[in-house]
Amino acid sequence: MERKLNFIENKKLKNYDPKNYKEGYLKIGKLIVTYIYRKDKIKLDGTQSHPCYLYGYGSYGVIDDPTFDKYTMSLVDRGYLYCIANLRGSKFYGPKWYHEGKYLKKKNTFKDFQTIAQYLIHQNYTSPDKLVVEGGSAGGLLIGSCINMNPSLYHVAVLRVPYVDCLTTLLNPDLPLTIGEYNEWGNPGKYKTYYDYILSYSPYDNIDLKKQYPHIYIDTGLHDSQVIFHEPLKYYAKLTHNQHFQQNTRTLLFNIRTQSGHSGSSKRYQQIIDETQVLTFILKQNK
């Protein structure tokens, strides 16, 4: 029996024509990067580098399927190459791929993300002075770890409700979600092997006060029960002692959303305001 898809409905959006955009994917070994760009703004042939936004998560088996997003299009319409990285720690290739990016193999997630960033630069699709990276929650841990490992690779880093003081959190079983997190990261309070491994990549614990970091935007929700606001705040406070942020050669911005939780605000227009603030930061630093 032949199977086919039937077209049911097409919702037309103002100021949007899908014919203006090119979608596709890059394959870097087993790593898959999905992308979208505007045809009249970008030629993806390596002859010229472009501003690039690279998103990553890579935890809990979550697969980042590309979906239409009005905030994405705001960057794409301004000439950005918009990319989503599928990393070990997701289930993009199934359970084995997930297990290759958790517990004592968590650093594989960070290696994958950096491999993708380096590939985009090597192919001259972008350059270190044009590359924006973003991750939220466990994706914030990803970004925080990567900018510690190789800060010169990125120009702007956006960390949304980031899980950046992971070791301290995992050592406190009285917090509501800690015990459940042992299934993803391990139990550092019980096993020294996990303690040492998590310590080696924890974004907060590995901040370098002398290195030049990218421009950094951090946000948190005052009512976040998953990554409690004091965790990103503690991370921000330590970063303020970095000599380049003190000398204002790099921008460091912390935004606490007083009416938001882990997934943002439930108010009708507040999400638009919140996302506009992030886009403004990116565009201002990535002129």
Map each language-model feature to its residues.
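Conserved long hydrophobic alpha-helices within structured protein cores
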Residues: E2, G29-Y35, Q226-K234
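A structure-centric signal for secondary-structure junctions around beta-strands
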Residues: E2, K30, S49-H50, Y154, ...
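Cap/lid segment of the alpha/beta-hydrolase catalytic domain
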Residues: N6-V132, G136, L171-N172, Q259-S260
